[in-house]
């Protein structure tokens, strides 16, 4: 199809032509239903263009084809080679490879050294006239500033981009420039001052459109594959919403796509991958040579680009554009791209989202995504439906699962399998339980949604106390005035927002988990990266959990009814018990290990109540010795973890940490084997002889009391293992129990012995693993000039001709579609010495309280205190208490899961569509 244009200044002279079958190779990206390839051709170049053969045209077109039209092939079964380029008029080849290598995303352009993208080359491209080597002089135009200080300029987009828009969306007669111009605004203010009163505005509001859903993608330094995965997934989800046929909401009051805005917030220019900017430029929401470092000496805090595009780039660098009106065609998407001048962390990015853009657009729902998280089909619709069907729902999250690779090949990595199981069980047991109570302790920032009016006010005010750019304004309430405990709390800032939302005075907002919404994210695959990530998670969640427990009294000022408050109190008790068990988990794991070794490895003589047992598995002589060696090895590696955590970075001790995972995994495997032997030995005696059914009292006494082990073991097997299997099968998602659960059983002790030890020993480190940057890029400035007679302030801006815009775009697309080669960077972290004293006190109190519990359970000398003089008796009592407590907590989780599953099934039947 080719759009023939309207007026002479609109789209004339720039066609979009489809390739005939067999002209290229279209490798299909997994999970992507729209496959296309972008090829650029230049018929005006000397000799035969390297792209001429891709067109496959047998005769010249009726009129000249644009030098920079986007031409796509939808022939996935076509051959993988194209004809080799003939020499040019000088008898020399073009220098570009013509092979479409499937491993290269279907684009095999050889790239001259001059186009290799680096930070330096990106900075050079921002200078005026950089694309022409500075030799060409452009005409200029005068741009009036809004209210005398706000610089907002409309720039023509490349012809190929505006030609990609379907004709039915182009309002040429109405004079709309939505698809013809990209809008750039240099925000020289704080996000709180980005208001209509101060002269700032956004396109959707200027077009008088109601924004129902604002989708935010926060970015730090991810590569273009990760961003493309998120961005393309979002556009596919928007297509799902637009294609709804029977919706009573989306199909009234204007097209559905006009009610959705996608906002990308980049945390600083310096750390951003410049290849990602090329991808955004290919879509149409960014251009080189536009950004201004300052406006008349006032520093630009954020560069804001706005455009509505129908183009998308897949993770394997394939350009997708509309070809027909079929259901697979992507609709127009309204984009806001906020490129912050400096790195100021994720909370500040959310302040731009909520306080700047949110207040102008006033959306009903805000959906938060991290770059790299791919929403599954119809997931964003499922999140929105949750709010649409529940007027009191203030926040929600979906299921996040680990990216396992093609055919699940990443599951061969034990760390990936362990994290996959952790995510799955959290989604099956933990989130449904908390959702049943009405308070989900954490809505992951990588995939969650909030009702905008629910978080306005105190929730966002408390949340933004963690923004270091507000530290001078907030004073003692800001991040610089906080103690180390509060600073750690803001490492898990999403937990703070969740608590403040539920506890909002006079309101009855609750939080929910939505099963139908699913998102896929990549997880750390190396030990060092895994440990560093969990340091922030564990410390932040521990501090935030204590914060919510200490401030539970604020719930009484909310508007929740008595039934909801009753369940909040049950959840409070459950959370207190979880915090206590987490605190003493270091001792619990060691005691469990030593008790099981002693039970199996100590020979016993026959008595009236039990038969004789030899030490297992190595005999009476060798087994106690081997068990003692393993216990000492356990303690030795535990001490090593403290030494490593206090003085080394995970990346600097990578092999030692890998050895620690192996040692603890080996000991845990040995314990699992011994546990299996204990179970078999306990059931050597028929269970009917061990448990009495004569009366209720006799059953309770024989099952839970006495010397019989069958009751304790049955409870442990059913609650620790059985409920996981039952819940997973009822959830219709049991596969992780087969391919990931065994890995988790082997490595579960490392969550405490390695991850928590490292986290608590680095309590003083309140960094995100990223540091703020004060480096200002060498970008051009905008200088204000005024006329002699008090004329309005204006800025002179280059008026670049369309041919030069298109020429620049050709190079941009080449860079964008090049495969990304990952460069490993050395992480640098500054340790704050002033926090080490607090860190030391925390670690010592934690270590000594756990050591005291071990001594109390195992020592022989407690006669003076009135305790039993038999340490084996105390060990058995502790072990029974531990198992029963774990069983009770597991039953509570399972009950919440059952309630959630039933409620979800009923709501599916009665919910409004």
UniProtKB/Swiss-Prot annotation:
Regions of compositional bias (Basic and acidic residues) in chain numbering: 41-56
Record's signal peptide: none
Record flagged with keyword NAD: no
Recorded phenotype for the gene knockout or disruption: Leads to a winkled surface morphology. Significantly impairs conidiation. Impairs penetration in host plants and exhibits a significant reduced pathogenicity in Arabidopsis and cotton plants.
Membrane-spanning ranges: 566-586, 625-645, 658-678, 712-732, 740-760, 840-860, 881-901
Keywords, in A-Z order: Cell membrane, Cell wall biogenesis/degradation, Glycoprotein, Glycosyltransferase, Membrane, Transferase, Transmembrane, Transmembrane helix, Virulence
Residues carrying sugar: 25, 539
Domain of life: Eukaryota
Cellular component GO terms, alphabetical: cell septum; plasma membrane
Broad class of where this protein is predominantly found: membrane
Paired cysteines (S-S): none
Location of this chain's protein in the cell: Cell membrane
Entry's EC annotation: 2.4.1.16
Topology term for the membrane: Multi-pass membrane protein
One of the record's GO molecular function terms: chitin synthase activity
InterPro entries hit by this protein: Chitin_synth, Chitin_synth_fun, Chitin_synth_N, Nucleotide-diphossugar_trans
Catalytic reactions on record: [(1->4)-N-acetyl-beta-D-glucosaminyl](n) + UDP-N-acetyl-alpha-D-glucosamine = [(1->4)-N-acetyl-beta-D-glucosaminyl](n+1) + UDP + H(+)
Pfam families: Chitin_synth_1 (PF01644), Chitin_synth_1N (PF08407)
CDD domains, alphabetized: Chitin_synth_C
Gene Ontology BP term (one): cell wall organization
Region (Disordered): 1-135
KW Glycosyltransferase (keyword) present: yes
PANTHER family to which the protein is assigned, alphabetical: CHITIN SYNTHASE (PTHR22914), CHITIN SYNTHASE B (PTHR22914:SF11)
Entry's family note: Belongs to the chitin synthase family. Class III subfamily.
Function: Polymerizes chitin, a structural polymer of the cell wall and septum, by transferring the sugar moiety of UDP-GlcNAc to the non-reducing end of the growing chitin polymer. Plays a role in cell wall integrity and is involved in tolerance to hyperosmotic conditions. Required to successfully penetrate the host plants and thus plays a key role in pathogenicity.
Entry protein name: Chitin synthase 1
Protein species of origin: Verticillium dahliae (strain VdLs.17 / ATCC MYA-4575 / FGSC 10137)
Gene that this polypeptide is encoded by: CHS1
